[in-house]
From Swiss-Prot:
CDD domains noted in UniProt: SF2_C (cd18785)
UniProt biased composition (Basic and acidic residues): 458-468
Span of domain Helicase ATP-binding: 98-254
Main location: virion
Record SMART domains: DEXDc (SM00487)
UniProt similarity note: Belongs to the helicase family. Poxviruses subfamily.
Its job: DNA helicase which seems to act as a postreplicative transcription termination factor. Involved in ATP-dependent release of nascent RNA. Forms a stable complex with single-stranded DNA, and to a lesser extent RNA.
Protein name according to UniProt: Transcript termination protein A18
EC numbers for this chain: 3.6.4.-
Region (Disordered): 456-478
Native source organism of the sequence: Myxoma virus (strain Lausanne) (MYXV)
GO cellular component: virion component
Presence of the UniProt keyword Plastid in the record: no
Length: 478
């Protein structure tokens, strides 16, 4: 159980450092999720993970006793690259120190996209030799964990059919590793069971959870805290440090040649009645999350055609071979899918539709293909999509925050036989109402990709459309 105590000024100040002036929410002694104000005389459950960092004074020692040993006799360490071994060495040294100083054995592995967090975590799982729960945000990530866990030769159970089905299964069967989706944690009985019978908890893609919200995961970490806990992420959420406060971050030296290709095109103005109606919502509360910006962008036929022509040309000439085209809306996704199918057929073009239960099988089939165009949404492909062979990313949407951008670009930052990785951006629109918004969001993508992820920006290229010359010569001037 987390520590239930009053929060003095020093600890309150320490916790607020992670919140960027946002309010601090914790469970009070009555187990209600409430805002914590300074100098409060009330008691709150303080997540033990915050004490994993030696900069935070302990309220009381944390004695970690792990009794749930793995049962597989032939547990095997998976092979690691030298940099992954360095992470393991740092983590194990830190964990020994935590054990000896009576601090919780909690650590965030802040490692870049493509580093191999999954295999590194599985190695640590074998190091601890304790039964483990691996928690993922959605079913899409289960396949890559299954493949990594199999390398350890530990017994495992994958739960995709709901927590009630899993609980029935656990009555007659046990396993060293449980792979679950996070919504299982809404079941209190299940939370207590894994707290009692499993010692290690691995939270994949931890940035996808805001632990300042009253969620199933927040409750689990507060009332059923694991004995050993790892958060895995390439883009850590600062507020989550309150639940897992120690971080290991090893910079990856990559041999990848990462280029950012910006395709400029100066269009004639384009509009339709549909666009004009949607444009009326741009400066209203209805566009709070820029949904109408994306809806209008999906209707930008000249820009859409430019994207299709650019990708088709590069694909035909073999300049790109394994391409992912990413949009925000399903309507936009099906538009591009249909266009590319017209050009190349279904032997080369695939749809990453989150609503299609067969999509995971499609993704698995792409691992063996030499050439393909995969069209999907940022929601489906932004986090956890595991196709290491991807060599090109085509970003068709606009509205992405820095975390989403980094996760999306991470799809083409994986080490593979292709060392050349290309990201395509299309910063122009034929629709004047969203011209400045598109430019603003594109600059954000450029900034994250070049300043943070090491992409090299190529000279801007494209076509400049001159209306007068177009009419005179019936041709486009490059």
């Amino acid at each position: 159980m987390s520590v239930c105590s009053e929060i003095d000024y020093a600890l309150y100040t320490e916790l607020k450092k992670f919140l960027n002036s946002q309010p601090l929410f914790l469970f009070n002694a009555d187990k209600n999720f409430v805002e914590v104000v300074p100098s409060s005389s009330f008691k709150f459950y303080i997540p033990i993970g915050v004490f994993s960092n030696s900069d935070v004074a302990l309220i009381r020692p944390v004695h970690t006793t792990c009794t749930n040993h793995i049962e597989s006799a032939d547990a095997t360490f998976p092979n690691l690259y030298p940099l992954q071994k360095r992470v393991v060495a740092e983590v194990t040294t830190s964990m020994r120190q935590k054990l000896s100083t009576h601090r919780p054995m909690y650590m965030t592995l802040h490692l870049s996209c493509g580093f191999g967090k999954t295999i590194t975590a599985c190695y640590l799982m074998v190091v601890h030799r304790r039964k483990t729960v691996i928690c993922v945000p959605n079913k899409m990530l289960i396949h890559q964990w299954k493949a990594a866990v199999e390398l350890t030769k530990l017994s495992y159970i994958i739960s995709t059919d709901g927590v009630s089905v899993l609980l029935k299964q656990l009555r007659t069967k046990t396993a060293d590793v449980l792979i679950i989706v996070s919504r299982h944690l809404s079941n209190d009985y299940f939370c207590k069971k894994i707290h009692d019978e499993y010692d290690t908890f691995i939270l994949d893609e931890s940035h996808m959870y805001n632990l300042m919200n009253n969620s199933a995961l927040t409750k689990f970490l507060t009332f059923y805290p694991p004995r050993i806990c790892y958060f895995l992420t390439a883009t850590p959420r600062l507020a989550n440090r309150i639940y897992c406060n120690d971080v290991v971050n090893v910079l990856k030296v990559s041999t990848l040649m990462k280029r950012l290709k910006i395709v400029e095109y100066f269009f004639e103005p384009y509009s339709t009645e549909c666009i004009r109606q949607m444009a009326k919502h741009l400066n209203t509360e209805n566009n709070k999350y820029h949904i109408y910006t994306e809806k209008i962008l999906a209707e930008d036929l000249p820009r859409n055609n430019l994207i299709v022509d650019t990708v088709s040309r590069e694909f035909k000439h073999g300049l790109v071979e394994r391409v992912i085209v990413v949009v925000k809306l399903r309507k936009h996704m099906t538009f591009f899918y249909d266009k590319f199918v017209e050009e190349f057929g279904t032997d080369y073009v695939y749809l990453g539709d989150a609503k299609n239960k067969d999509t995971s099988a499609v993704v698995k089939s792409l691992l063996q293909k030499k050439k393909f165009i995969f069209v999907s949404t940022s929601h489906y492909s932004g986090t956890g999509l595991d196709i290491p062979s991807l060599d090109s990313l085509v970003i068709c949407c606009a509205v992405l925050n820095s975390m989403q951008i980094e996760q999306l670009l991470g799809r083409v930052c994986r080490e593979s036989e292709s060392v050349k990785k290309t990201v395509f951006l299309f910063p122009n629109t034929s629709i004047r109402e969203i011209k400045h918004s598109l430019g603003f969001f594109t600059e954000r993508i450029v900034s994250v990709s070049t300043d943070k992820l090491g992409f090299q920006q190529e000279g801007k290229e494209g076509t400049k459309e001159e209306p007068a010359l177009t009419k005179a010569f019936s041709s486009q001037i490059r």
